Swiss-Prot record:
SUBUNIT field: Monomer.
Protein name: Elongation factor Tu 2
Sequence segments annotated as region (G2): 60-64
Molecular function GO labels: GTP binding; GTPase activity; guanosine tetraphosphate binding; translation elongation factor activity
Length: 394
């Protein structure tokens, strides 16, 4: 079957459902798909299609995720839904499904539950920028005051994790009733879609961000100088641009004197392209794999950071035994491994395969990093964990 052509006319936004088990995340996903298809056109996916999530592998980690798409008049959305709690943890930490915003589903019959809190914390740690709340199962609660109480509780919980709990949209609805086609509840799904459109800003495209290229290889071309190669992660580099070489050693400045792709000379290299960048006056030994080429001042080297980490289970090819404080694995950032030590949270003695944990990492040499950068934890070339930089310390 031929693939449908992807029409990029409208802005594209990535969202997903998060929240406690059985609060109705998948039912809501199906309801959004149905109501928006019915209202604005498009293909509706039913509950069983979404619930039967295919298994994916991201950096060797098994994750079950459902991807659906839907449209509002002004935007195209890609929406992820996961069947199990562990899938959410892995998904958010590996960045397998980056979210520009999340829909937090809370059953009004239960109020916030342990995984509600954990998903909010994870969203904070991995940098999900916006959360919208959908209070589900409101058809089962007759008491208006009870609904207000649950809403207050959810807002307070979000504020506790530095989300704007008082200001973010909370929609009270019933995913099941909307799916059954009851107009008053379908209207709530449209209200949710409007909130997605108005509350989540249009994400900045990679090409509009400051230039960054992780260096994979360094060559010396006689008579021309030093060329670094890699895939441009974000932004654009033009011939004549001043750039910085960041990470591992002291940051140095140089100028891009040429860009080439497949042996052809170009004026610029753009996000997503594999290219070689010729650097003025830079010696072959001044640059190495693991450094990045970046727009001056846009990124700094750091060694110590707080991270959220998922430790692979034995079945995923991870460790068979726990690790303890003083553990010294390799941390793989972009193109290179760096040794580092870990500090576990107070009261945590050991970490078991399959756990997710907050830890402070100190690397033996600095790496160019921003909050939100993903990394792998490796032992002898084998991946044993995945993590994300939550907060830079030094």
């Amino acid at each position: 079957m031929a693939k449908a052509k992807f029409e990029r006319i409208k802005p594209h936004v990535n969202v997903g459902t998060i929240g406690h088990v059985d609060h109705g995340k998948t039912t809501l996903t199906a309801a959004i798909s149905h109501v928006l298809a019915k209202t604005y056109g498009g293909e509706a996916k039913d509950f069983s299609q979404i619930d039967n999530a295919p298994e994916e592998r991201e950096r060797g980690i098994t994750i079950n995720t459902s991807h659906i798409e839907y449209d509002t008049p002004s935007r195209h959305y890609a929406h992820v839904d996961c069947p199990g709690h562990a899938d959410y943890v892995k998904n958010m930490i590996t960045g397998a499904a980056q979210m520009d915003g999340a829909i937090l589903v809370v059953a009004s019959t239960d109020g916030p539950m342990p995984q509600t809190r954990e998903h909010i914390l994870l969203s904070r740690q991995v940098g999900v920028p916006y959360i919208i709340v959908f209070m589900n199962k409101c058809d089962m609660v007759d008491d208006e005051e009870l609904l207000e109480l649950v809403e207050m509780e959810v807002r307070e919980l979000l504020s506790e994790y530095d989300f704007p709990g008082d200001d973010l949209p909370v929609i009270q609805g019933s995913a099941l009733k909307a799916l059954e086609g009851q107009p008053e509840w379908e209207a709530k799904i449209i209200e949710l879609a409007n909130a997605l459109d108005s509350y989540i800003p249009e994400p900045q495209r990679d090409i509009d961000k400051p230039f960054l290229l992780p260096i994979e290889d360094v060559f010396s071309i006689s008579g021309r100088g030093t060329v670094v190669t890699g895939r441009v992660e974000r932004g654009i580099v033009k011939v004549g641009d001043e750039v910085e070489i960041v990470g591992v050693r002291t940051t140095t400045k140089t100028t891009c004197t040429g860009v080439e792709m497949f042996r052809k000379l170009l004026d610029e290299g753009r996000a997503g392209e594999n290219c070689g960048v010729l650097l003025r006056g830079t010696k072959r030994d001044d640059v190495e794999r693991g450094q990045v080429l970046a727009k001056p001042g846009s990124i700094n080297p750091h060694t110590t950071f707080e991270s959220e980490v998922y430790v692979l289970s034995k079945e995923e090819g991870g460790r068979h035994t726990p690790f303890f404080k003083g553990y010294r694995p390799q941390f793989y950032f972009r193109t290179t491994d760096v040794t580092g030590t870990i500090e576990l949270p107070e009261g945590v003695e050991m970490v078991m395969p399959g756990d997710n944990i907050k830890m402070v990492v100190t690397l033996i040499c600095p790496i160019a990093m921003d909050e939100g950068l993903r990394f792998a934890i490796r032992e002898g070339g084998r991946t044993v964990g995945a993590g994300v930089v939550a907060k830079i310390i030094a």
